[in-house]
Amino acid sequence: MSRRCELTAKGPQVGHKVSHSNIKTKRRFLPNLCNVTFISDALGRNVRLRVSTNAIKSVDHNGGLDAYLMKANAAALSPRALELKRAIEKKAAEAAPVAKAS
């Protein structure tokens, strides 16, 4: 399992640990990742993803997983998240003609 957010593609960064005597040694800054279960209203099921805490805030801000994925850039999403996005778009397209007919 890689240390990369499935929604925002945040990954490890490299920097320096600087001692008191100003000696620099390489270190890695790892993203704050959490295993989170989101509820997809369009799909009608729970979706478990490994995302950064920043992504959790973004999903909340956009009004849920479905709304976030509809707005998200496909290049930043993991293959699993991209499959979810396509499935949600497909469900939304199926539901749209029914809403217009009523």
From Swiss-Prot:
Annotated gene: rpmB
Any GO MF annotation of the entry: structural constituent of ribosome
Extent of the signal sequence: none
Protein name (database record): Large ribosomal subunit protein bL28
Entries under PANTHER family matching the protein: 39S RIBOSOMAL PROTEIN L28, MITOCHONDRIAL, LARGE RIBOSOMAL SUBUNIT PROTEIN BL28M
Gene3D superfamilies on file: Ribosomal protein L28/L24
Region annotated Disordered, chain positions: 1-20
Gene Ontology, cellular component aspect: cytosolic large ribosomal subunit
Keyword flag DNA repair: no
Disulphide connectivity of cysteines: none
Keywords: Ribonucleoprotein, Ribosomal protein
Any single biological process term in GO: translation
Family under the similarity heading: Belongs to the bacterial ribosomal protein bL28 family.
